[in-house]
Amino acid sequence: VGPQSGVTNETVRPAWYALRGGGWRDWVTLLHPPYTLWHLSYVAVGAGLAPHFHLDRLLWALAAFFLAMGVAAHAFDELHGRPLHTHIPSSALAVAAFVALGGAAGIGIAAASAWGWWLLVFVAAGAVLVPAYNLELFGGRLHNDWGFALAWGAFPALTGWFVEAQTIRFEALAVAAYAAALSLAQRTLSTPVRRARRAEGTLAGTETIERTLRWLTWASVMLAVAVVAARLR
């Protein structure tokens, strides 16, 4: 299928949320804003459903995941093949990735010293998952649908729960399964869109899927807002 009439490979942006290339816009696009918010919502839902809730712990967890997932993971991803076609220098991407990942790990270590040393298990797991998934280390064995669902769905939700509860119960596994299942749905929808935009240079067949992804983003974020708001009452 070729590009739509009047649309060329040069005018098809690599993602529905991508800004026009160049300068600060490349950095905004790099963050994948809708999807970063979507996956941060899993942290909030996990924390909000835990038996004990501390707003400060949630905020620190969100900060750590924003650095690790929103910045580091996406910077590594752009280093590995330039899927967003940004003009950000590779050196700047590498610095952003390692500084952000180090910042996230620092938050995690400080949190573990204050709230419980078992958090270090999650810190270590995150420090491995971010480069392993996005740089396709270990032969790319983690870079698949289930790797995405577990790393960017189940893991944030389970971490959000553990930050608050310092233990794992059935409910924690259930919320992790929710996040993994929704992430699989996201991946199923976004894969053909990425292929159309980035490999084929066409928007044909993307409109309905992308509209669905937009609404799912809003739904995920609003669920997180509702859960946290209920705990703050």
Residue ranges and their predicted role:
Residues 6-86, 92-130, 150-233:
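Hydrophobic alpha-helical transmembrane segments
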Residues 135-146:
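Membrane-helix interface "capping/anchor" motifs
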